[in-house]
Amino acid sequence: MTSIRIGNGYDIHQLVEGRPLILGGVQIEHSLGLKGHSDADVLTHAIMDALLGALSLGDIGHYFPPTDPKWAGADSLKLLEQVHQLILDRGWQIGNIDSVVVAERPKLKPHIEAMRDRISQVLNLSPELIGIKATTNEKLGPVGQEQGICSYAVALLTSDS
């Protein structure tokens, strides 16, 4: 009998000057970047939290605390590799991931395919199992006022054991 688990994740980071904007492992040209201890890739962080949550393994702050200097400037795709290994070590496989990035600017649609490709390579999944959408917050709240970018993700895990 196949078992399934579903997890959801969320992340938000402030937009600031002097930092690159990295989403889904892709550097995107923009005048502002996301502030954070690592590369502040909100999409990848939300995906990691969804994967961890599906197995009740806590959140990324437990595994990669922002107070630990060894994670300063970390490439979030490298962290995603480690989270994926935790999932595999417990006998689970990723069924699919669906996500949305919320940002007023820049327009993200031209970058979605590259983000999907990067994430699918790290997770060794077919790109059609990775859903990434982009939307705005209709100028509402801190994301709508271009103070930050956030992301939501849902992950489905399966196990035959």
Swiss-Prot record:
SUPFAM superfamilies the UniProt entry points to: IpsF-like
Broadest EC class assigned to this enzyme: lyase
GO MF annotation terms: 2-C-methyl-D-erythritol 2,4-cyclodiphosphate synthase activity; metal ion binding
Its EC number(s): 4.6.1.12
Any one GO biological process: terpenoid biosynthetic process
Pathway: Isoprenoid biosynthesis; isopentenyl diphosphate biosynthesis via DXP pathway; isopentenyl diphosphate from 1-deoxy-D-xylulose 5-phosphate: step 4/6
Cofactor binding remark: Binds 1 divalent metal cation per subunit.
Catalyses which reaction(s): 4-CDP-2-C-methyl-D-erythritol 2-phosphate = 2-C-methyl-D-erythritol 2,4-cyclic diphosphate + CMP
Gene3D superfamilies attached to this UniProt entry: 2-C-methyl-D-erythritol 2,4-cyclodiphosphate synthase (3.30.1330.50)
Cofactor(s) of this protein: a divalent metal cation
Keywords noted in UniProt: Isoprene biosynthesis, Lyase, Metal-binding
Binding site for 4-CDP-2-C-methyl-D-erythritol 2-phosphate: D11, I12, H13, H37, S38, D59, I60, G61, T135, T136, N137, E138
Pfam families reported in the protein's UniProt record: YgbB (PF02542)
Binding-site residues for a divalent metal cation, renumbered to this chain: D11, H13, H45
Marked site: Transition state stabilizer: H37, T136
The protein's role, per its UniProt record: Involved in the biosynthesis of isopentenyl diphosphate (IPP) and dimethylallyl diphosphate (DMAPP), two major building blocks of isoprenoid compounds. Catalyzes the conversion of 4-diphosphocytidyl-2-C-methyl-D-erythritol 2-phosphate (CDP-ME2P) to 2-C-methyl-D-erythritol 2,4-cyclodiphosphate (ME-CPP) with a corresponding release of cytidine 5-monophosphate (CMP).
Subunit structure of this chain's protein: Homotrimer.
Family membership noted in the UniProt record: Belongs to the IspF family.
Name of the molecule in the record: 2-C-methyl-D-erythritol 2,4-cyclodiphosphate synthase
Protein source organism: Acaryochloris marina (strain MBIC 11017)
